[in-house]
């Protein structure tokens, strides 16, 4: 009798395990549309981070004395690297003319800055552009 119970137990276990080895059907999700109220699509504004929003303003067209890195001054002769470093080290500025109050500027440097006032702008400090040392070394090498 014990042998028959053992044999029946082993056979039942084998039969149960054999069912798991076969391929199972994919579970079909039921549709809840019949239970739910029809949904109306909502028009949403495309999300935009603060850095991209600032780039769409005057900041993207001129050099922002509070947020731009040193390399942006390369395109203007005489500003890179000495004046650019002084401008960035003494930021923030409330208006473009404040850059003339930098300590240790020569008359020639002041004239050079004045001649480039139309290329400068001042906006509020943006952490995305000022965190770490990105204003001095933004990691772009030629």
Curated annotation (Swiss-Prot):
Q: Which GO terms describe its biological process?
A: photosynthesis; photosystem II stabilization
Which InterPro entries does this chain map to? PSII_PsbU
Where would you find this protein in the cell?
Answer: Cellular thylakoid membrane
List the record's Gene Ontology CC terms alphabetically: extrinsic component of membrane; photosystem II oxygen evolving complex; plasma membrane-derived thylakoid membrane
Q: Looking at the keywords, is ATP-binding present?
A: no
Q: Tell me, what's a Pfam family for it?
A: PsbU
Which residues, by range, are in coiled-coil regions?
none
What is the annotated signal peptide range for this record? 1-29
Quote the Gene3D superfamilies the UniProt record gives.
Photosystem II 12 kDa extrinsic protein
- In terms of domain of life, where is this protein from? Bacteria
Quick one: where is this thing mainly located? membrane
Question: Which keywords fit this entry according to its UniProt record?
Answer: Electron transport, Membrane, Photosynthesis, Photosystem II, Signal, Thylakoid, Transport
What membrane topology term does the record carry? Peripheral membrane protein
Q: Which SUPFAM superfamilies match?
A: PsbU/PolX domain-like (SSF81585)
What function does this protein fulfil? One of the extrinsic, lumenal subunits of photosystem II (PSII). PSII is a light-driven water plastoquinone oxidoreductase, using light energy to abstract electrons from H(2)O, generating a proton gradient subsequently used for ATP formation. The extrinsic proteins stabilize the structure of photosystem II oxygen-evolving complex (OEC), the ion environment of oxygen evolution and protect the OEC against heat-induced inactivation.
What does the subunit comment say? PSII is composed of 1 copy each of membrane proteins PsbA, PsbB, PsbC, PsbD, PsbE, PsbF, PsbH, PsbI, PsbJ, PsbK, PsbL, PsbM, PsbT, PsbX, PsbY, PsbZ, Psb30/Ycf12, peripheral proteins PsbO, CyanoQ (PsbQ), PsbU, PsbV and a large number of cofactors. It forms dimeric complexes.
Tell me its family: Belongs to the PsbU family.
What protein is this chain from?
A: Photosystem II extrinsic protein U
Q: What organism is this sequence from?
A: Trichormus variabilis (strain ATCC 29413 / PCC 7937) (Anabaena variabilis)
